[in-house]
Structure formats: C-alpha cells, structure tokens
Amino acid sequence: LQKVEPRLAESVREQPELRALLKPDGGFLWRRVAGEQRLSPHAYGVALDLSARRAPYWRWSRLRPHPMQQSYPAAIVAAFEAEGFIWGGKWHEYDLMHFEYRPELICKARILRGLEKMNAAGLGTGGTERGMEKLP
C-alpha cells in the first residue's frame, strides 16, 4: 500500500473528485467470504475495500454486468494493479470496492498476454518446444 499511495495522490491531484472513492471501509478483519465457509482475503490482511457505499457489489445489485464496472475510474484501478493488486470490479461476481494483493495473478496475466501476442504475431513455436504451445 505504501507504493500505491503516491500513485493515488498523483491521480487525486489531477482529478480531485477521485478522493470520494478512496475512503477505506474494510481492511484486516477476520471473517468468512459471504455465503461460504472459506476465509476472506481480509482475514489474511491482503484485501481492502474502498468507499463501500459508493461501490456496487453483485449480491446487492440485480444488474449484471453493472454499468459502474466500465465507468469506475481507471486511474484508481491502474494504481493498485501496478503494485500487484487485483480489482474485484473485473470479476463476474463483481465487488467494485474490493482490492486484493495478488501479485502472482498479475504476473501470470502479463505472461499469458505476452504469449498471446507472440502467437498472434506468428512468433510462438507452434509446438511443445520448451513447454510452449500455441495458445488457442
């Protein structure tokens, strides 16, 4: 979070209206995922919620997808993703207030995107050489 804060501060300087979406509403809290038996990422201290009253959650809304999934400020999402967080607004069962520290998922997504670009450009091996196959 220490690395995310300067990115957010710069975004707020450029777009002061973002400040209203940056109020922490949930961080480290021992609890289960709603409707499930497994522990929430909040229980491990790797997730936080921002401005819960302003951010739709799939269990509270009948809209699927929710229009705010497209209109949520990209600067906020980019600031968190640049430092290894994923945003719950990209999920089918969306949680727009939720950011979760999962650098391994960000890394994997970047690798897969790179492989897709290589294959699209005809640079993939097309076989199993070095374990690399053309992606479908």
Task: Enumerate the language-model features and the residues they cover.
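Low-complexity, Gly/Ser/Thr/Pro-rich intrinsically disordered linker/tail segments
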Residues: 82, 95-136
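Cell-envelope/glycan interface and biosynthesis
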Residues: 1-91
